Amino acid sequence: MLFIKSLLLLLSLIFAVSNATGYVGFKVDGPGCNATKIITLENGACQTVCTNLYGKVTPTNDPSKFNLNPFIDVDCKTPLMAEQQVTCLPDNKPFKVSTLTVTCIPDTTSSSTSPSSTSPSSTSPASTLIGSIAFVTLAALFALI
């Protein structure tokens, strides 16, 4: 019985970690934007996106979906528009958010996305957090069995 619990726990760890990885940042192109600048995924931190455009990005339970909150002030207190949930597209395909074109940068340590030569090699803090939470939750459930 202990062997089965251990095996299930190991499989849940592998599943949680493999599903927690996804994207580490974004490239934004449009008026006042530098299309070569990578905006790293910093969970909920106010960041400069383009000239006079700031934003917060928060991950969701799906590693390819994010909530975007655009602001017009450097303190991220005055919203430009309502929060939008966006889905990163595979193979570095860009998508539109209002007048901006966004390209998600995949995590090169992830097998669930296509590698990119411009991708950073670090693991996303948000992905690590999601994976840790998923693992701890599954471990607690298996401990109760």
Curated annotation (Swiss-Prot):
GO cellular component: cytoplasmic vesicle; membrane; plasma membrane; side of membrane
Membrane topology category: Lipid-anchor; GPI-anchor
Inducing stimuli: Up-regulated in cells that are either actively phagocytosing bacteria or in cells that have been cultured under conditions that promote the generation of cells that are competent to fuse with the opposite mating type during sexual reproduction.
Localization annotation: Cell membrane
Main subcellular location: membrane
Top-level taxon of origin: Eukaryota
Keyword annotations of the record: Cell membrane, Glycoprotein, GPI-anchor, Lipoprotein, Membrane, Signal
Lipidation (GPI-like-anchor amidated serine): 117
Region (Disordered): 107-126
Residues linked to a glycan: 34
Residues of the propeptide: 118-145
A GO molecular-function annotation: actin filament binding
Signal peptide positions on this chain: 1-22
Post-translational modifications reported in the UniProt record: The GPI-like-anchor contains a phosphoceramide group, rather than a phosphatidyl group.
Keyword Hydrolase: no
Biased composition range(s): Low complexity: 108-126
Job description of the protein: Binds F-actin and nucleates actin assembly.
Family, as annotated: Belongs to the ponticulin family.
Record protein name field: Ponticulin-like protein B
Organism listed in the record: Dictyostelium discoideum
Native organism taxonomy: Eukaryota, Amoebozoa, Evosea, Eumycetozoa, Dictyostelia
Gene (name only): ponB
